[in-house]
Amino acid sequence: MQEHYYKFWREMIKPKGFEVDRDSLRDDYAKFIIRPLERGFGVTLGNSLRRILLSSMMGSAITAVKFEGVLHEFTTIPDVLEDVTDIILNLKEVRFKQYTADSLTLKISKKGPGKVTAADIQTTDKIEVLNPDLPIATLGANANFNAEIVVSFGRGYVPVENRETDLPVGFIGVDALYSPIRKVNYNVSNARVGQRTDYDALTLEVWTDGSLKPEEAVALSSKIMKEQLQIFLTFDETMEPAEEARELGSPTLNENLFRSVDDLELSVRSANCLKNANIRYIGELVVRSEAEMLKTKNFGRKSLNEIKEILGEMGLGLGMKIEGWPPAGWDPSQPPQKRETQQ
């Protein structure tokens, strides 16, 4: 591949990590913010991750059920309010966390009167019910409810007719929705890097059934996408033209470190505080700790929070320990020509 392609590839903005909204974080919900991204990449990544999350995550589901004295689903059980079809629909809503990939057969046995709930499913140490309060059936005084359910581990949605295995005698097949993902939303907004505000910030919200944490789901979906795209890499990613490598100097340093603090577009008060502290470049700023900054004359919490927020959008922060900073021979009054000419 020609050298100018490598140059463009390396100079593209890449996300500096992702933030998790800790205030709303639960075992079944999380909000992630990824920024900055090149313009258009928010929709590209958000839509791709959403589709993979909804279609390709592994989970558990009931795949077959057997009721004592019942031969097919279009019938009823004596002194049970719901018919068999409704009971099966209720069973499909039971969510499990399975600790083995093997199919498991579980039993339900209860006499009336009363309600059968997911808590009545007799589990083992290999599986647990996540929504035990879910109602399954309503029993009359003379009802005797006995059932066996088969719980399997799989991916996506698999209807009965697409399953290859034959059912044991007396079992009724159940369409299986294995996916632990309940809902995925994404939103793209503007992100700022220096003076430019037309970069993307991707907000991704993930709801699960609790059997898989949202952070794990996003990591798995990203891994799947990476492996599916790997086949298109027909060139050596590690190749770097020697001439350009020399021009760039140390490739490990974030280019934003060499930008003027004026590019942060701070309030007048904050900008004057940095000027009084003789901080001219972002690299000189990020190595200062919060405590050091608060000792600066007229520098208060409001200015501190303003700077932290803007640095965070660039993937930087205060109190950073940066290997190789400042670069050998670098004169802040005469920044390298390469740094000045970069967009």
From Swiss-Prot:
Gene3D superfamilies: 5' to 3' exonuclease, C-terminal subdomain (1.10.150.20), DNA-directed RNA polymerase, insert domain (2.170.120.12), RNA polymerase, RBP11-like subunit (3.30.1360.10). GO terms for cellular component: cytoplasm; DNA-directed RNA polymerase complex. The keyword Nucleotidyltransferase applies. Residues 253-343 are annotated as: Alpha C-terminal domain (alpha-CTD). Coiled coil: none annotated. Its EC number is 2.7.7.6. Keywords: DNA-directed RNA polymerase, Nucleotidyltransferase, Transcription, Transferase. It is an enzyme of class 2 (transferase). DNA-dependent RNA polymerase catalyzes the transcription of DNA into RNA using the four ribonucleoside triphosphates as substrates. The N-terminal domain is essential for RNAP assembly and basal transcription, whereas the C-terminal domain is involved in interaction with transcriptional regulators and with upstream promoter elements. Belongs to the RNA polymerase alpha chain family. This is DNA-directed RNA polymerase subunit alpha. It comes from Bdellovibrio bacteriovorus (strain ATCC 15356 / DSM 50701 / NCIMB 9529 / HD100).
